[in-house]
C-alpha cells in the first residue's frame, strides 16, 4: 500500500510541478516487469528516469536522476542514505522527503528558466576595453548595464544580478521579519539558490529549548514555503563551510546575511555580507546594487613552512597592515606567486578572517589571481543539474592576471616569514609571535568555528597525537573541538582522528558556531581565559566577561596539554609532513576529489581565459518603463523634514555590533523596541536611560558598527529612540543597514566637530540645510541620493512593498535633482535623511 500511494503522489507531483504525464498503470506495470531488482523507492525513481529519457524528456530525466543521487547519498554527506532499501525499510518521513525533493527540483528548473541569464562572456578581450581587477570584472559581468563600454571604475553605481543568497537560522529571523512586519510573505527569485543552515544557536543539546525549537521550525517553514533545494537543516554544517566546499564557484556574486560570507573569496567569488533586510530584498528579486569599490592588492611571495595554514597567514597580514588603514572602504585582492602554494582550506581561513581585518567591515574579495593549478573542492552533491555556462566560463577567468588593472595600493607579504602567531584579546590586530608570549595560562582551549578548516583539524589532531606519544599529561581545563560540518566529521572519524581528540579530553559537540558566538549550548564563563582558533576575539564574544585570544588550531592543540601558551613548532617536529599530506589526500578522495587537485598539484584541464561582457546603458530599454522611486514615496501631507534637536551621547572608535546589541538578545527580541531594551547593556548600561532622557544623537568615532553584519544593531538603536548617528566613518554593512531600515547616519571628518561635540552637549541637525549646529559652530554634510530615497520611503523593505521586483531598477536610475520640497514626505521620527557618502 505504501508503494502504491507513494507512486501516485510522485505521479501527481510530476504532473503539477513538471507538467509531465505518465500513466499510472504504465509505471506500475513497468515496475513489475523488472525481475530481480530491489523493490523500493530508489528503483521507482530509476524507472521514472528511464521512462522520461525514453520520451525524449532528457531535462526532466536529469532532474529525477539528481533527486535519486541525493536519495542514495549518505546522510553525513547531505543525502537520505536509503540506497538498496525496500519499501518496508523506508519510513513515511523519508518518503515525504523524496516527494518534496522531486517537487523542489522540478520547480527549480522552472525558476531558473524564468530568472535573468548573464550575457555570454567574450572569448577575447575587446581591444577598446581597459584593464579591470577581478572585483570590477565580476560586478561588470553581473551588471544590467554599465555607464561606459571600456570598463567600470570605482564609484560607478551598478544594479547587478546575484548568484546565491546564504543565511543562518538566526539571520533568517531578521530576514523574514523585514517582510512580515509589512504583511508580506518571504519569496525567492530562485528556489535552488538559497543556502540556509542552522548553525548559530541550534544544537542537539538544546533542541528541547522553546527558542531553539522556534528557530528549527523557522528553518523547516522556509524549506517548505520556498520549496528550497539547499536547506541544510540543523547542525549539518556551519553555513560557510560546506557552501564554499560544495556550491561557491569562481566569478560568482554571493550575498549573505553574515559578515563571514566573504569566506567564498577562497574560490575567487565576490561574496558579500549584508544586513538581513538587504539580503531579503536580494533573495526576493535576484538583484541588488553596489557602488564599485576601490581595491588593494596583496601579493604573496616566498614559500610557507608545510605546517603554516591560513590562520597564521592572515594573522601575519593583520600584524603588518593593521585595521582601518589601507583596506578601509576597499576590497582586498590576494595573488602573487605564493598564492599557488596555498590550499583551498588556507585560502578559506584567510578570506574568512578578512571580515575582521578591517573594522569598516568591507566585503572582502579573495581571488587567487595568479593560480592556474588549484581547482576547488567538489563533492558528490555539487549541483551538476543546471550549470550556468557563462558563469562556468567566467570562473576560469578568475585565475587570470590583471596587468594594468587599477589598485589603490599594492603590498607584498613573504609567506616564508610567517610563523605561529596569536592575536591578543580584545583586538584581532594586536598580533605577536607565539614564541614571545609562551606561558600564558588558560582555563579552556577551543578548536572550531568556520575559520578552522578540515586541514587545520587534521594537523591539530596530529599535534595532539605527537604529544600523547611523548607522554604529555593533561592538566585541568575545558577542551572543545567543533568541526565545521558532518562531512568533515566523517573524514576525521575515518582517519581515526576523532579518537585522538577524545583521548586528549576534547568534548565534541555537533557542527555549529559554538563558543565563537557564545549564545548556544557553549558559553564561556565570566572571567575565564580561553585560547581559541575562532575568528573573532572581541569583548564578550565567547560569553559575557570571558577573555579569548585567537591563534591557529595547531597552536591551540599544543597548548591544551598544560593549558599554557605553547609554541607548536616543537611538537610539529614529531609530525610527519608526508602523513599530513596523505591524510588530506584521503579527505579529498572521500569528497569525490583527487590528489592532483591539492595545492601544488597539476591541473589536467586546459584553461581558457575569457572576459566579461559589458552591457551598455541602452540595455535598460528592454525592461520597459521603470517607476521612479520618488513617485512611489508615501505622502505625508505638507509636513516638511524638520530638524533634530537633541543632546549628544559620545562614544569612541570601533564600536562593534556585539556591543550595540549582544548576540543573546537577538534570539529573543523580535521587535525593534525589544531589541532597544538590550542596547549596549553589557558595555554601556547607562546608555538606554540617557537616550530616554533626550540624548538621541550618537557621536561616534571610526568604523562605527564594525563586527557582525547583524541588522539588529541599527534596529536596536531605532527601537530605543535614537534619531541619528554621526561618526568619522561607518562599517560598510552597518552604514548600509542604517538607510535600509530608515535611519539617519552622517559622516563628519572635521576634527573641530569632535572637539565641540562633547557628552551632553546640545546639537541640532538641519537636514534640509545639510548642516549640523553644535557649541555655536556649524558643520556641513552631504546626502547620498540613493540613501535619501530609501529613507524617504521608510527603508528598503517598504520600498520593495511599493515597487516589488522593480525596486532596484528604480533605486539605480539616475535621479533628477531633488528640490528641497521633495523632502516634505519624510520625517525625522521615521528615519530622517542620510549624511554620508556610500563608497560601496
From Swiss-Prot:
Enzyme nomenclature, EC number: 4.2.1.-
CDD domains: IPMI_Swivel
Gene Ontology terms: biological process: L-amino acid biosynthetic process; proteinogenic amino acid biosynthetic process
Keywords: Iron, Iron-sulfur, Lyase, Metal-binding, Virulence
Pfam families reported for this sequence: Aconitase (PF00330), Aconitase_C (PF00694)
Parts forming coiled coils: none
GO MF annotation list: hydro-lyase activity; iron-sulfur cluster binding; metal ion binding
Protein task: Aconitase; part of the gene clusters that mediate the biosynthesis of AM-toxins, host-selective toxins (HSTs) causing Alternaria blotch on apple, a worldwide distributed disease. AM-toxins are cyclic depsipeptides containing the 3 residues 2-hydroxy-isovaleric acid (2-HIV), dehydroalanine, L-alanine which are common for all 3 AM-toxins I to III. The fourth precursor is L-alpha-amino-methoxyphenyl-valeric acid (L-Amv) for AM-toxin I, L-alpha-amino-phenyl-valeric acid (L-Apv) for AM-toxin II, and L-alpha-amino-hydroxyphenyl-valeric acid (L-Ahv) for AM-toxin III.
Family: Belongs to the aconitase/IPM isomerase family.
Name the UniProt record assigns to this protein: Aconitase AMT8
Organism whose genome encodes this protein: Alternaria alternata (Alternaria rot fungus)
Amino acid at each position: 500500500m505504501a508503494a502504491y500511494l507513494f507512486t501516485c503522489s510522485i505521479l501527481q507531483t510530476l504532473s503539477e510541478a513538471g507538467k509531465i504525464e505518465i500513466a499510472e498503470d504504465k509505471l506500475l506495470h513497468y515496475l513489475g516487469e523488472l525481475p530481480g531488482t530491489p523493490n523500493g523507492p530508489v528503483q521507482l525513481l530509476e524507472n521514472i528516469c528511464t521512462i522520461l529519457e525514453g520520451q525524449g524528456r532528457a531535462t526532466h530525466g536529469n532532474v529525477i536522476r539528481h533527486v535519486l543521487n541525493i536519495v542514495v547519498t549518505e546522510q553525513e554527506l547531505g543525502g537520505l542514505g536509503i540506497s538498496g532499501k525496500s519499501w518496508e525499510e523506508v519510513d513515511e518521513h523519508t518518503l515525504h522527503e523524496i516527494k518534496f525533493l522531486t517537487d523542489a527540483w522540478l520547480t527549480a528548473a522552472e525558476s531558473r528558466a524564468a530568472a535573468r541569464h548573464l550575457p555570454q562572456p567574450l572569448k577575447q578581450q575587446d581591444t577598446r576595453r581597459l584593464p579591470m581587477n577581478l572585483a570590477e570584472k565580476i560586478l561588470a559581468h553581473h551588471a544590467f548595464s554599465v555607464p561606459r563600454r571600456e570598463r567600470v571604475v570605482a564609484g560607478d553605481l551598478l544594479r547587478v544580478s546575484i548568484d546565491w543568497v546564504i543565511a543562518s537560522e538566526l539571520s533568517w529571523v531578521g530576514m523574514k521579519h523585514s517582510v512580515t512586519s509589512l504583511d508580506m510573505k518571504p519569496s525567492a527569485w530562485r528556489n535552488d539558490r538559497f543556502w540556509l543552515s542552522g548553525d548559530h544557536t541550534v544544537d542537539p543539546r538544546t533542541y528541547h529549548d522553546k527558542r531553539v525549537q522556534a528557530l528549527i521550525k523557522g528553518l523547516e517553514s522556509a524549506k517548505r514555503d520556498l520549496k528550497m533545494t539547499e536547506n541544510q537543516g540543523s547542525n549539518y554544517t556551519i553555513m560557510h563551510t560546506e557552501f564554499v566546499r560544495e556550491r561557491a564557484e569562481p566569478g560568482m556574486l554571493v550575498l549573505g546575511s553574515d559578515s563571514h560570507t566573504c569566506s567564498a573569496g577562497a574560490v575567487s567569488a565576490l561574496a558579500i555580507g549584508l544586513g538581513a533586510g538587504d539580503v531579503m530584498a536580494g533573495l526576493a528579486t535576484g538583484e541588488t546594487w553596489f557602488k564599485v569599490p576601490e581595491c588593494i592588492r596583496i601579493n604573496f611571495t616566498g614559500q610557507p613552512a608545510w605546517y603554516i595554514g591560513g590562520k597564521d597567514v592572515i594573522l601575519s597580514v593583520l600584524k603588518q597592515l593593521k585595521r582601518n588603514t589601507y583596506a578601509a572602504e576597499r576590497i582586498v585582492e590576494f595573488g602573487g606567486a605564493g598564492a599557488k602554494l596555498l590550499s583551498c582550506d588556507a585560502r578559506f581561513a584567510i578570506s574568512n578572517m578578512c571580515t575582521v581585518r578591517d573594522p569598516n567591515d568591507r566585503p572582502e574579495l579573495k581571488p587567487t589571481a595568479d593560480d592556474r593549478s588549484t581547482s576547488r573542492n567538489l563533492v558528490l552533491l555539487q549541483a551538476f543539474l543546471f550549470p550556468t555556462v557563462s558563469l562556468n566560463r567566467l570562473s576560469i577567468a578568475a585565475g587570470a592576471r590583471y596587468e594594468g588593472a587599477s589598485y589603490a595600493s599594492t603590498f607584498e607579504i613573504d609567506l616564508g616569514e610567517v610563523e605561529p602567531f596569536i592575536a591578543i584579546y580584545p583586538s584581532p590586530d594586536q598580533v605577536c609571535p607565539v614564541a614571545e608570549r609562551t606561558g600564558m595560562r588558560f582555563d579552556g582551549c577551543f578548536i572550531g568555528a568556520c575559520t578552522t578548516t578540515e586541514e587545520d583539524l587534521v594537523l591539530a589532531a596530529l599535534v595532539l597525537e605527537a604529544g600523547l606519544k611523548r607522554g604529555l599529561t593533561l592538566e585541568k581545563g575545558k577542551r572543545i573541538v567543533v568541526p565545521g560540518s558532518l562531512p568533515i566529521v566523517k573524514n576525521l572519524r575515518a582517519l581515526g582522528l576523532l579518537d585522538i581528540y577524545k583521548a586528549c579530553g576534547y568534548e565534541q559537540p555537533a557542527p555549529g558556531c559554538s563558543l565563537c558566538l557564545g549564545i548556544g549550548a557553549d558559553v564561556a564563563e565570566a572571567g575565564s581565559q580561553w585560547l581559541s582558533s575562532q575568528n573573532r576575539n572581541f569583548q564578550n564574544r565567547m560569553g559575557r566577561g570571558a577573555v579569548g585570544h585567537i591563534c591557529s588550531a595547531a597552536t591551540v592543540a599544543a597548548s591544551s596539554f598544560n593549558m599554557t601558551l605553547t609554541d607548536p613548532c616543537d611538537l610539529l617536529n614529531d609530525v610527519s609532513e608526508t602523513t599530513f599530506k596523505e591524510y588530506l589526500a584521503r579527505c579529498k578522495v572521500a569528497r569525490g576529489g583527487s590528489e592532483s587537485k591539492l595545492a601544488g598539484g597539476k591541473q589536467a584541464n586546459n584553461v581558457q581565459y575569457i572576459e566579461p561582457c559589458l552591457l551598455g546603458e541602452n540595455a535598460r530599454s528592454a525592461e520597459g518603463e521603470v517607476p521612479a522611486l520618488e513617485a512611489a514615496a508615501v505622502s505625508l501631507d505638507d509636513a516638511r523634514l524638520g530638524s533634530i534637536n537633541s543632546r549628544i551621547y559620545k562614544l569612541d572608535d570601533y564600536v562593534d555590533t556585539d556591543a550595540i546589541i549582544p548576540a543573546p538578545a537577538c534570539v529573543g527580541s523580535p521587535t525593534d523596541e525589544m531589541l532597544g531594551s538590550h542596547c549596549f547593556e553589557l558595555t554601556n548600561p547607562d546608555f538606554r536611560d540617557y537616550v530616554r532622557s533626550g540624548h538621541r544623537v550618537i557621536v561616534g568615532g571610526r568604523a562605527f558598527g564594525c563586527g557582525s553584519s547583524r541588522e539588529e544593531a541599527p534596529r536596536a538603536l531605532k527601537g530605543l529612540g535614537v534619531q541619528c548617528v554621526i561618526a568619522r566613518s561607518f562599517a560598510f554593512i552597518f552604514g548600509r543597514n542604517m538607510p535600509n531600515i530608515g535611519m539617519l547616519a552622517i559622516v563628519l571628518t572635521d576634527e573641530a566637530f569632535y572637539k565641540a561635540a562633547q557628552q551632553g552637549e546640545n546639537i541640532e541637525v538641519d537636514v534640509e540645510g545639510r548642516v549640523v549646529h553644535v557649541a555655536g559652530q556649524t558643520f556641513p554634510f552631504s546626502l547620498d541620493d540613493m540613501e535619501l530615497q530609501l529613507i524617504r520611503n521608510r527603508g528598503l523593505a517598504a520600498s520593495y512593498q511599493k515597487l516589488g521586483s522593480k525596486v532596484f531598477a528604480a533605486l539605480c536610475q539616475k535621479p533628477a535633482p531633488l528640490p528641497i520640497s521633495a523632502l516634505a514626505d519624510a520625517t525625522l521620527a521615521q528615519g530622517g535623511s542620510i549624511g554620508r557618502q556610500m563608497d560601496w
